[in-house]
């Protein structure tokens, strides 16, 4: 009946039935007690499931079971399972990780208590929090015997031994392999005497085993293990369990727990719990490097450990192949695999699906309807789109559709307008070149530079020229040259820059040698004819008169034909002459050029416009850093005062780009806001080889580019001019026409494109845009060397013989530029002009045929000569016999020698005494106290470009030499030296021999890709670090109870401590150390999330750099922070750079208390800080003594412990980015005060994502994403002083210098690289900004000014070194008089001495008197030499420090700037240096050369000043002043700093020409620092000639020894000698430290022998 009813009746009936049933339910008694009796008693139900929102009924049933059925259930062994769907869904659906019965991998025999319970003893019911609630304890399963699942024969179990635990602990703590834990060694010997490690090991052993034997650290591992075994229970305890669980938590897949591993070891390998412990101990010691992702990987990992264990213990194990496929994560011996579980649950899933379909059918719901509708819609849309795209591709072709893609981006625009800076740079380069060569320089190049200097000159350039003229007073020729240049600059300042044409009068020349080689050259024409003369009509003997090579045409009457116009041509001739005489100014004009690729006619036009002062926007379709750099170089060479060049990416085939380009030019907001005066649409595309039947999509694309979109471009300009009402300033359009109207053929639609442009001549009259655009068509002739015509260069000479004139690019550019002169522009505004610049190409009949004939003739002539030569050679062979083969002796004798790399330490060259030193001795000899003069004898560096030597090659020369490539390849682990029967370099991977000359070719590309400033290479900074995936933690409150987690009991208690009642702990019913935890609703979780950082580029040390290369041992590498490793390597470099191969050598000259260390850092051991905070927080494995590695002073401590073993002063500067120069100040003060005579200084820092992130938050660093969007490469992103700079680039590494007293350096023969003349730090004014740029170092120029009107004429007489010398001479006489007086009084003194002691008394007293006299003399030298200026308010510290060496502020040649590439730093720093120089009276025009090193290295914080100081010393050494190659355009605001020259290329000033260099450094926290280093020749001038010669002899021997040691170190990777004992014998420690007498008497004999052996070693 129901079935027969319709749907409405059925719903009504169902509603009525529901109401009746609910009424019955509410009206009837519950009868819950009776229901339970029936279910539990009558039916004896074992599995009861409650479906509902809470476990209400389940809890009631539990109480009933406890009160009524507990004893009967035990008696009958009945087990009940009570489940609630709200909590135990997985158990209900059998979806848990597994179902098992048993105790673990191998269940032990049931205990007596368990057996009693199984016989009916009392059991317990699990609490309400249990996932399953067994009512009674189950009996021990029969399967839990000694037979594993799978039926495999069990292995006899054996407890883990104490030795295994001891070995595991030692392996993990010492970070060594298990095989390196030798049983016969003690803990003390294994830890290398590191007490911290010893204490950690002993503490962990005590925690694990309880009491330990006395002096456990001195027992061998075997003896210690045997002693511990006596009381060892065989159970893993606190320390090992913590390591075990940490290993599983960090290295195993999420579901692979300790219990899972035990189950697997039991089921697959039959291992009992004891042997499982042994394998787990192996896992702790040999854990994988990173987390295993799949359980299969984990099982494979444990398989390997089992095999290792079996081999170690001589076991033969057979694996149960089926066990590996079973589900993991089970706690018992019975295992239910996935197939069985699927079989159990599969029926339920099928039933659910069937019910769903029935309900859907009943409700008339189509379950697949929406999916089908969406699929049909998607298919329809996709089909239509695909059809449309296919039609477009078929119609237009792939070349066309790809070729019209837009590329324009206003963000990528590059602007160049700092011509003033490049003019000064050209002037300085010209000056130093003529100074070095005595005036012998390339004439043409000098003339071009002079023209550029003239065009771009500003008033300060005149001051520089005036000073240069003064320096060449004794050289009349050079003085005259610069005087004339100065006059032309003055004229240019009066009249403005002008374009002046000086094209080369050269013609084409094709020659064919006797060997048949074809050569094309440009040679001076035999009869040069100026371009202006090419407009004259030639004499014609033909019936039809010939037109001039260059002429203008006009229309006659109403005809559309163009004919020669004498009047217009005469006007054109006048401007051609004007171009070579007075020129033309383009100042104030705005020009657009498309198609001005380097080497094109457009590029030459661009040069002329820039030389004339125009603003030009040029487009390029191949926008890249290399292309932009070519335009930058072009502007640098020719840009004049007021000119500007803008380069943008642009595809003229794209309509979108045409619109965007014009908008960018005219828009005031975000654009240039220009109104164009000229447009040169020169963009073209070659179409070679395309005849009429081969017109293809490329031809259409070219036609669109050269004609269609040219018209669109002009239309867009017209629209913008009309919109802004610009009717009185029409834009001149130079249309690039062609005489090739199909004459050549085979060039696609090229001629049609050019002919199409000629229609504009008529449209100018017929349309409404003549007020906005004027038109000048230029028929461009045969131009040699362009992209379109370079292939025809060989026939150009022959073409000229046919009566056609060919042009160079410069000549054609002049012709076109003259069309833009004011005269021609005025003519264009009246009517379109037609300029025929074809050189009468159209007059040559059958041009294509003629060209082919010429080409054929050339090739035939060449082939004939080659054949003739070959025939002659054959005749010679036949008449003279066989020629020698390549293997014959003569051939070998004449083989070209291969290049050999001479990698060596860069000792500075010796200074010639007569030429460079002697002229200074008159003032300086004997004028300073050498014990209080501080010199730099050596330096080291680890940075993005390797060491200091390789960094200098890139900084000074822009490329690596062969030696630089060899050293970098060694440093990066690409090659190694093999000492075999045939020693030499071999490839580190293939072991193939690599000759020296092959290294650069083979490895340079790889080296350049993995050095310098580049995208972050995550592998260097931790396995889980990537800048695009910075991990952060997000706190959440969970909304429902989590599924159970299996964790160690200790972890569970810790979670309980943190979360309180939000955590339920379910103990393991078998009493194991694992338990289950339920995180309840409301618990707090920290969920990892990732942040995409936009700082992805930094300066990084070379990929592959490894401290092992220096011989630093593995135990040190594993112990110390990377910054310490950098500092150790730097210290080794610095020592070798000083010629010191064994640091203990210095103790033959000074006491151990006189060697100091002042190295510092801004952050210290940053990697260790990360581990200490993040690693500990995340419970990663971290060494126990990590705290000590975080201290800044630990770096210097390791240097002393492993290298120096000194007892001298140790001071640790922390000055942020100014740390290194602050370190120099500390070292300087330490030496000047006499506390030390030898000192390490410098700084170092590492990189970390935390610092990167925080600098980004401060907006201090450049945004990498923005930089890439602007078209910058990684290497360009640090641009100090550039107008587009936008933040610094982080970097890392370290730098070290060795400072000594001058006397020690001379005594030891150490190389003197520079004198520290001055170094001080300064704080700043009141502020609230820690990183604000400081002004404090201005105080280094402080001095009292006289109130006299002529105060500039008054200065302290002490500044005159002659005055000081007179005073010193007088003081010397006083000292000598005092000494003589004391010696005379000695006779009175001995009257009171016993006769037997008189001789000794006289000798000792005489020595004392002489020593006092020497001390007085040194004090006099110091106070009248080194420190005469100190505490004198009338002498500025900078002025006084220079005056010590006879120098003035005008002798400060170079300033090395901190230059971080931030907006504020350069403005502040440059203004500071400018203020210092001006205040101290530096002469006008005497510019200081600015160096901005961080463009190359990035900003390494603590190491910054050290790298800059190293560079400053290299400048003094070589005379090369490096340019800032990333300085594409100097910020306009920096132009006001008239005393500073900003360079973007290196200047070679000549070796020995640099006198003093300033280095400034600034750090967060008000740290400002400045130091001045002076050339060592000024120090040598204080010595007698004999002293200097003796010093050179010592230095030469030292250099020879150091080079030999360095060669051997490179070959053996042993540049570092680990010091294991101090330089004195153990029994002499007290004597050595307390006795200040000559230290060599206390140096250990073994050390002395080592030094002697090194000195006698052959190189």
From Swiss-Prot:
Record domain Ketosynthase family 3 (KS3): where: 1030-1575
Listed name of the protein: Fatty acid synthase subunit alpha
Domain of life: Eukaryota
Molecular function per GO: 3-oxoacyl-[acyl-carrier-protein] reductase (NADPH) activity; 3-oxoacyl-[acyl-carrier-protein] synthase activity; fatty acid synthase activity; fatty-acyl-CoA synthase activity; holo-[acyl-carrier-protein] synthase activity
Region (Disordered), start-end ranges: 114-139, 1631-1659
UniProt similarity note: Belongs to the thiolase-like superfamily. Fungal fatty acid synthetase subunit alpha family.
Pathway per the UniProt entry: Secondary metabolite biosynthesis
Lineage of origin: Eukaryota, Fungi, Dikarya, Ascomycota, Pezizomycotina
Reactions listed under catalytic activity: acetyl-CoA + n malonyl-CoA + 2n NADPH + 4n H(+) = a long-chain-acyl-CoA + n CoA + n CO2 + 2n NADP(+); a fatty acyl-[ACP] + malonyl-[ACP] + H(+) = a 3-oxoacyl-[ACP] + holo-[ACP] + CO2; a (3R)-hydroxyacyl-[ACP] + NADP(+) = a 3-oxoacyl-[ACP] + NADPH + H(+)
Region (Ketoreductase (KR) domain): 588-826
Record-linked InterPro entries: Acyl_Trfase/lysoPLipase, Fas_alpha_ACP, FAS_alpha_su_C, FAS_alpha_yeast, FASI_helical, Fungal_FAS, Ketoacyl_synth_AS, Ketoacyl_synth_C
UniProt-annotated catalytic positions: 1217 (for beta-ketoacyl synthase activity), 1458 (for beta-ketoacyl synthase activity), 1499 (for beta-ketoacyl synthase activity)
Knockout-associated phenotype: Eliminates more than 99.5% of aspercryptin production.
Carrier domain residues: 160-235
CC terms in the record's Gene Ontology section: fatty acid synthase complex
Record's subunit section: [Alpha(6)beta(6)] hexamers of two multifunctional subunits (alpha and beta).
EC number: 2.3.1.86, 1.1.1.100, 2.3.1.41
Keywords: Fatty acid biosynthesis, Fatty acid metabolism, Lipid biosynthesis, Lipid metabolism, Multifunctional enzyme, NADP, Oxidoreductase, Phosphopantetheine, Phosphoprotein, Transferase
Inducing stimuli: Expression is positively regulated by the aspercryptin cluser-specific transcription factor atnN.
Modified residues (O-(pantetheine 4'-phosphoryl)serine): 195
One biological process term in Gene Ontology: long-chain fatty acid biosynthetic process
Changes after translation: 4'-phosphopantetheine is transferred from CoA to a specific serine of the acyl carrier domain by the C-terminal PPT domain. This modification is essential for activity because fatty acids are bound in thioester linkage to the sulfhydryl of the prosthetic group.
Biological role stated in the UniProt entry: Fatty acid synthase subunit alpha; part of the gene cluster that mediates the biosynthesis of aspercryptins, linear lipopeptides built from six amino acids including 2 highly unusual and nonproteogenic amino acids, 2-amino-octanoic acid (2aoa) and 2-amino-dodecanol (2adol). The core structure of aspercryptins is as follows: Ser/Ala-Thr-Ile/Val-2aoa-Asn-2adol. The first step of aspercryptin biosynthesis is the generation of the fatty acid precursors, octanoic and dodecanoic acids, by the FAS subunits atnF and atnM.
């Amino acid at each position: 009946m129901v079935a027969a009813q319709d749907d409405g009746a059925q719903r009504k009936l169902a509603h009525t039935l529901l109401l009746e049933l609910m009424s019955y339910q509410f009206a009837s008694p519950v009868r819950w007690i009776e229901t339970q009796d029936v279910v539990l008693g009558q039916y004896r139900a074992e599995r009861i499931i409650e479906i509902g929102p809470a476990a209400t009924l389940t809890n009631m049933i539990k109480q009933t079971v406890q009160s009524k059925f507990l004893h009967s259930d035990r008696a009958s062994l009945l087990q009940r399972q009570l489940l609630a769907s709200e909590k135990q869904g997985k158990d209900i659906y059998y979806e848990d990780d597994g179902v098992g019965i048993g105790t673990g991998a191998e269940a032990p025999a049931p205990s007596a208590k368990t057996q009693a319970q199984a016989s009916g003893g009392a059991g317990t019911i699990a609490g309400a929090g249990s996932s399953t609630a067994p009512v009674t304890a189950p009996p021990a399963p029969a399967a839990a015997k000694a037979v594993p699942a799978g039926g495999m024969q069990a292995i006899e179990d054996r407890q883990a031994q104490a030795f295994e635990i001891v070995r595991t602990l030692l392996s993990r703590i010492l970070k060594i392999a298990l095989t390196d834990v030798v049983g016969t060694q003690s803990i003390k010997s294994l830890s290398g005497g590191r007490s911290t490690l010893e204490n950690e090991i002993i503490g962990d052993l005590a925690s694990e085993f309880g009491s330990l034997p006395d002096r456990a650290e001195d027992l061998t591992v075997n003896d210690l293990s045997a002693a511990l075994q006596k009381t060892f229970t065989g159970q893993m305890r606190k320390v090992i369990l913590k390591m075990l669980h940490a290993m599983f938590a960090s290295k195993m897949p999420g579901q692979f727990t300790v219990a899972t591993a035990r189950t697997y070891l039991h089921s697959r390998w039959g291992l009992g719990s004891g042997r499982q412990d042994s394998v787990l101990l192996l896992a702790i010691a040999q854990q994988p490097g990173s987390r295993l992702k799949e359980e299969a990987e984990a099982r494979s990992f444990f398989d390997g450990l089992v095999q290792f264990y079996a081999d170690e213990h001589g076991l033969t194990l057979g694996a149960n192949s089926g066990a590996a496929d079973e589900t993991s994560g089970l706690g018992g011996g019975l295992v239910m695999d996935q197939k069985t579980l699927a079989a159990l649950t599969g029926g339920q899933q099928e039933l659910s699906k069937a019910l769903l379909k029935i309900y859907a059918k009943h409700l008339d719901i189509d379950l697949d309807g929406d999916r089908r509708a969406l699929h049909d819609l998607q298919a329809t849309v996709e089909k239509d789109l695909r059809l449309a795209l296919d039609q477009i591709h078929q119609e237009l072709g792939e070349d066309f559709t790809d070729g019209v893609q837009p590329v324009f981006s206003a963000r990528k625009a590059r602007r160049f307008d700092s011509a003033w800076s490049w003019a000064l740079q050209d002037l300085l380069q010209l000056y130093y070149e003529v100074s070095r060569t005595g005036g012998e320089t390339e004439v043409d190049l000098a003339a071009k530079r002079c023209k550029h200097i003239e065009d771009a000159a500003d008033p300060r350039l005149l001051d520089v020229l005036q000073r240069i003229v003064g320096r060449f007073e004794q050289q009349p020729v050079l003085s005259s040259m610069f005087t004339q240049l100065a006059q032309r600059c003055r004229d240019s300042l009066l009249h403005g820059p002008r374009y002046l044409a000086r094209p080369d009068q050269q013609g084409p020349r094709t020659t064919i040698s006797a060997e048949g080689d074809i050569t094309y050259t440009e040679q001076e024409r035999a009869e040069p004819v100026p371009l202006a003369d090419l407009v004259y009509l030639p004499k014609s003997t033909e019936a039809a008169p010939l037109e001039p090579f260059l002429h203008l045409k006009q229309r006659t009457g109403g005809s559309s034909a163009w004919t020669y116009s004498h009047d217009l041509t005469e006007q054109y001739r006048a401007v051609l002459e004007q171009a070579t005489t007075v020129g033309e100014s383009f100042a104030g004009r705005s020009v657009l050029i498309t198609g001005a690729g380097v080497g094109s006619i457009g590029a030459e036009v661009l040069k002329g416009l820039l030389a004339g002062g125009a603003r030009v926007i040029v487009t390029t379709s191949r926008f890249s850093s290399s292309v932009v750099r070519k335009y930058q170089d072009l502007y640098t060479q020719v840009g004049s005062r007021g000119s500007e060049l803008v380069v943008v990416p642009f595809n003229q085939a794209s309509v979108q780009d045409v619109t965007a380009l014009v908008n960018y030019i005219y828009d005031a907001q975000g654009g240039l806001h220009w109104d164009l005066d000229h447009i040169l649409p020169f963009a073209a595309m070659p179409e070679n080889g395309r005849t009429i039947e081969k017109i293809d999509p490329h031809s259409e694309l070219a036609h669109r580019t050269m004609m269609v979109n040219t018209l669109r471009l002009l239309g867009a300009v017209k629209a913008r001019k009309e919109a802004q009402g610009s009717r009185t300033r029409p834009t001149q359009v130079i249309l690039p026409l062609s005489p090739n109207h199909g004459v050549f053929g085979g060039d696609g639609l090229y001629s049609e494109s050019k002919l199409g442009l000629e229609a504009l001549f008529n449209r100018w009259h017929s349309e409404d845009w003549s007020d906005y655009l004027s038109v000048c068509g230029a028929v461009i002739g045969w131009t040699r060397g362009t992209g379109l015509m370079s292939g025809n260069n060989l026939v150009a000479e022959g073409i000229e013989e046919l009566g056609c004139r060919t042009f160079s690019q410069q000549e054609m550019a002049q012709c076109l530029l003259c069309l833009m002169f004011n005269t021609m522009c005025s003519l264009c505004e009246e009517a379109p002009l037609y300029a025929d610049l074809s050189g009468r190409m159209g007059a040559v009949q059958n041009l294509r045929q003629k060209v082919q004939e010429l080409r054929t003739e050339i090739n035939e002539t060449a082939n004939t000569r080659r054949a003739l030569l070959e025939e002659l050679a054959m005749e010679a062979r036949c008449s003279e016999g066989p020629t020698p083969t390549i293997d014959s002796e003569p051939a070998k004798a004449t083989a070209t020698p291969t290049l050999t790399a001479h990698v060596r330490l860069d000792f500075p060259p010796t200074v010639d005494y007569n030429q460079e030193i002697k002229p200074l001795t008159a003032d300086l000899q004997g004028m300073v106290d050498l014990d209080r003069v501080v010199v730099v004898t050596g330096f080291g560096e680890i940075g993005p470009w390797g060491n200091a030597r390789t960094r200098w090659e890139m900084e000074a020369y822009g490329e690596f030499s062969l030696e630089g490539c060899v050293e970098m390849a060694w440093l990066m682990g690409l090659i190694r030296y093999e000492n075999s029967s045939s020693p030499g370099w071999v490839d580190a991977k293939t072991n193939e021999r690599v000759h020296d000359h092959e290294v650069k070719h083979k490895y340079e590309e790889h080296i350049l890709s993995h050095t310098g400033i580049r995208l972050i290479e995550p592998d260097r900074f931790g396995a889980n670090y990537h800048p695009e995936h910075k991990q952060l933690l997000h706190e959440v409150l969970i909304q429902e109870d989590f599924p159970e987690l299996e964790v160690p009991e200790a972890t569970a208690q810790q979670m309980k401590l943190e979360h309180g009642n939000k955590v339920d702990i379910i103990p393991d019913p078998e009493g194991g150390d694992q338990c289950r935890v339920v995180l309840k609703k409301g618990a707090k979780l920290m969920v990892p999330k990732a942040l995409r950082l936009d700082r992805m580029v930094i300066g990084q040390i070379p990929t592959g750099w490894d401290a092992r290369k220096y011989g630093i041992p593995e135990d040190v590498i594993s112990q110390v922070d990377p910054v310490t490793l950098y500092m150790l390597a730097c210290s080794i470099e610095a020592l070798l750079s000083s010629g010191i191969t064994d640091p203990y050598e210095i103790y033959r000259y000074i006491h151990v208390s006189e060697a100091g260390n002042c190295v510092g850092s801004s952050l210290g051991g940053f990697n260790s800080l990360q581990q200490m905070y993040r690693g500990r927080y995340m419970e990663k494995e971290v060494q126990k003594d990590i705290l000590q590695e975080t201290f800044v002073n630990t770096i210097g401590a390791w240097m002393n412990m492993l290298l120096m073993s000194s007892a001298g002063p140790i001071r640790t500067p922390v000055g942020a980015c100014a740390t290194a120069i602050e370190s120099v100040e500390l070292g300087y003060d330490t030496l000047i005060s006499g506390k030390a005579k030898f000192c390490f200084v410098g700084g170092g820092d590492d990189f970390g994502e935390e610092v990167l992130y925080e600098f980004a938050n401060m907006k201090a660093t450049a945004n990498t994403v923005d930089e890439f969007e602007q078209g910058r490469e990684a290497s360009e992103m640090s641009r100090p002083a550039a107008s587009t700079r936008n933040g610094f680039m982080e970097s890392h590494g370290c730098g070290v210098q060795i400072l000594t007293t001058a006397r020690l350096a001379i005594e030891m023969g150490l190389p003197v690289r520079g004198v520290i003349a001055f170094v001080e730090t300064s704080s700043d004014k009141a502020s609230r900004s820690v990183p604000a740029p400081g002004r404090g170092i201005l105080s280094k120029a402080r001095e009292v000014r006289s109130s006299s009107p002529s105060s500039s004429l008054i200065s302290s007489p002490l500044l005159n070194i002659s005055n000081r010398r007179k005073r010193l001479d007088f003081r010397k006489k006083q000292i000598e008089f005092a000494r003589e007086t004391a010696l005379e009084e000695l006779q009175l003194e001995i009257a009171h001495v016993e006769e037997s002691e008189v001789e000794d008394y006289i000798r000792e007293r005489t020595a004392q008197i002489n020593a006092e006299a020497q001390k007085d003399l040194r004090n006099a030298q110091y106070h009248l030499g080194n420190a005469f200026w100190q505490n004198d308010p009338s002498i500025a510290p900078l002025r006084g420090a220079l005056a010590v060496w006879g120098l003035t502020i005008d002798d400060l040649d170079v300033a090395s700037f901190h230059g971080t590439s931030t907006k504020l730093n350069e403005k502040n720093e440059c203004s500071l240096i400018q203020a210092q120089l001006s205040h101290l009276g530096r002469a006008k025009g005497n510019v200081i050369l600015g160096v901005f090193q961080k463009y190359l290295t990035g900003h390494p914080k603590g190491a910054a000043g050290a790298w800059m100081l190293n560079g400053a010393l290299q400048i003094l050494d070589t005379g090369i002043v490096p340019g800032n190659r990333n300085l594409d355009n100097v910020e306009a605001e920096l132009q006001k700093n008239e005393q500073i020259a900003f360079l973007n290329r290196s200047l070679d000033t000549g070796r020995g020409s640099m006198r003093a260099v300033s280095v400034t450094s600034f750090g967060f926290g008000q740290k400002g620092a400045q130091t001045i280093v002076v050339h060592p020749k000024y120090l040598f001038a204080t010595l007698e000639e004999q002293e200097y010669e003796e010093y050179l002899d010592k230095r030469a021997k030292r250099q020879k020894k150091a080079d030999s040691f360095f060669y051997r170190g490179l070959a053996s990777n042993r540049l570092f000698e680990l010091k294991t004992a101090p330089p004195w014998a153990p029994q002499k420690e007290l004597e050595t430290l307390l006795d200040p007498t000559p230290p060599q008497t206390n140096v250990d004999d073994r050390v002395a022998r080592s030094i002697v052996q090194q000195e006698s070693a052959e190189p």
